[in-house]
Regions:
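Generic structural signal for well-ordered secondary structure
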Residues: 74, 112-113, 282
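Phenylalanine-focused residue identity feature
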Residues: 52, 80, 89, 111, ...
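Conserved lysine of the Walker
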Residues: 154
């Protein structure tokens, strides 16, 4: 097992398990501090302003701009990240350490969202993993993944399953691993992100959360019985079709099996991190997509996006999962 080494910051003291990782964090996180086997380790450490000042100077003079102005690979292999002037990160070249610094006062939930989402995805990829942009629920003991771009309805559909008694495994970022000749889906933070009006309509009028973006999206903590905290075998992947314009939406639920080639393309398009595009990562990404496409069914799911149609969509998915899982 690789050990996190942070030469310029104190050794993290708190250990958490998320996404199959052991996270050694200098920040207290509102998640269980469990122990046991893990896929890899990442240290989450506080960064002094001087460390980031040096990185910003390098980023400004760097000739490598393919990642854009807020994400720059530095000469020593580290990656400098900044999001919306809210927080900045330095991800070590080997992905073992994520150094973080909030740039302005914000809620812990907002900071955790960036730290455990976008920033952590760089560490994952540097350690050889390729996280998917997916939300996953557990149905009858198997993991069912919903893939799709932001705004396609992954979290809304998953919330409908949570409301009906199924557990959420992860929202937005999915890490898979090969275990006992099958793919295992690993749990993320026990929370879901929804717009307030959708949260109240799907989860109930008393639901509460904390706004994290200018678009008013909320982080909603889920109770113990609403989540699953251990790895679950992945049984099927649904790729959500693009929502149709008003007046042109489909009238029924359609589930169509994708060919292995189509599945590979869909899995590649729905990577969580679209920024890292070096040749080594792209080769691993193709191998990963091929492995997933050959291991589980990948299907295209189209349906009307009206909230009152969610029970019908849920029933169609339950019937399909039952046929596959037996």
């Amino acid at each position: 097992m690789r050990t996190v080494v942070a030469t310029s910051a104190p050794k993290p003291e708190r250990a958490y398990h998320l996404y199959g990782l052991r996270l050694r964090s200098e920040w207290p996180l509102p998640y269980p501090r469990t122990h046991g086997p893990c896929l890899a380790e990442v240290g989450l450490v506080r960064g002094a302003s001087s460390r980031f000042s040096d990185a910003v100077k390098q980023a400004r003079i760097s000739t490598n701009h393919e990642m854009g102005p807020r994400c720059v690979r530095l000469a020593d292999g580290q990656t400098y990240l900044q999001w919306s002037g809210r927080c900045e990160f330095l991800v070590s070249a080997d992905g073992l350490v994520v150094m973080a610094r909030p740039l302005r006062r914000s809620s812990p939930e907002a900071f955790h969202t960036y730290l455990l989402g976008q920033a952590l995805s760089f560490a994952l990829i540097k350690q050889g993993f390729d996280p998917l942009h997916a939300t996953v629920v557990v149905i009858g003991g198997v993991a069912v993944a919903f893939l799709g771009e932001s705004g396609y309805g992954k979290s809304t559909l998953s919330a409908a399953f949570v409301r009906s008694g199924h557990g959420l495994l992860t929202d937005d970022l999915l890490v898979l691993s090969d275990q006992a000749h099958e793919l295992a889906a690993h749990p993320g933070p026990p929370r879901i992100k929804l717009f307030p009006e959708i949260a109240r309509a799907v989860l109930g009028p008393k639901v509460r959360g904390i706004a994290i973006t200018r678009m008013r999206k909320m982080v909603i903590p889920l109770e113990e019985g609403q989540t699953v905290g251990s790895a679950v075998p992945l049984k099927i992947v649904y790729v959500l079709g693009k929502p149709a314009p008003a007046g042109r939406e489909p009238e029924t639920v359609t589930i169509r099996q994708l060919s292995q080639r189509q599945a590979c393309i869909a899995l590649t398009r729905n990577t969580f991190n679209t920024v890292l595009t070096d040749s080594e990562r792209l080769i691993r990404q193709f191998a990963f997509a091929t492995n997933v496409a050959s291991s589980v069914p990948v299907k295209l799911l189209t349906y009307p996006r009206a909230l009152d149609f969610l029970p019908t969509v849920r029933q169609a998915i339950l019937a399909d999962v039952t046929r596959i899982a037996g």
